[in-house]
Amino acid sequence: MKSVQFCFLFCCWKAVCCNSCELTNITIAVEKEECGFCISINTTWCAGYCYTRDLVYKDPARPNIQKTCTFKELVYETVKVPGCAHHADSLYTYPVATACHCGKCNSDSTDCTVRGLGPSYCSFGDMKE
């Protein structure tokens, strides 16, 4: 019985104390205005949960920073969007996460909104395979 209780407590501790922020494969819609359509690209990004709390009493002397699962390291890859007109710039550079961590969302490089457009949003509505 004690081993069952220990396993239960260990699992609870792991769920609360350990972050599950990790690399995951996603598909994003890539669009170039000059081309007039979107293509799908597979890339790697960060997803998961981070320990956070929302205090009832907001202390103005201590900022309340909500941590989110975000990239720690990035590389950039470039792809050629097929089917663009010859005069159009058909190269598209996009970020690929190589390491993740729980930290403050950097609004200079990341969409930190609660409900963004999402990675598969295409403003043209036309998705090429």
Swiss-Prot record:
Biological processes annotated in GO? follicle-stimulating hormone signaling pathway; G protein-coupled receptor signaling pathway; regulation of signaling receptor activity
Task: Give the UniProt subcellular location, in the record's own words.
Answer: Secreted
This protein's UniProt keywords = Disulfide bond, Glycoprotein, Hormone, Secreted, Signal
UniProt-listed SUPFAM superfamilies: Cystine-knot cytokines
Extract the signal peptide range. 1-18
Record InterPro entries:
Cystine-knot_cytokine, Glyco_hormone_CN, Gonadotropin_bsu, Gonadotropin_bsu_CS
Which GO molecular function, any one, fits this protein according to its record?
Answer: follicle-stimulating hormone activity
Summarizing the function annotation, the protein's role is: Together with the alpha chain CGA constitutes follitropin, the follicle-stimulating hormone, and provides its biological specificity to the hormone heterodimer. Binds FSHR, a G protein-coupled receptor, on target cells to activate downstream signaling pathways. Follitropin is involved in follicle development and spermatogenesis in reproductive organs.
The subunit structure is:
Heterodimer. The active follitropin is a heterodimer composed of an alpha chain/CGA shared with other hormones and a unique beta chain/FSHB shown here.
* Full protein name: Follitropin subunit beta
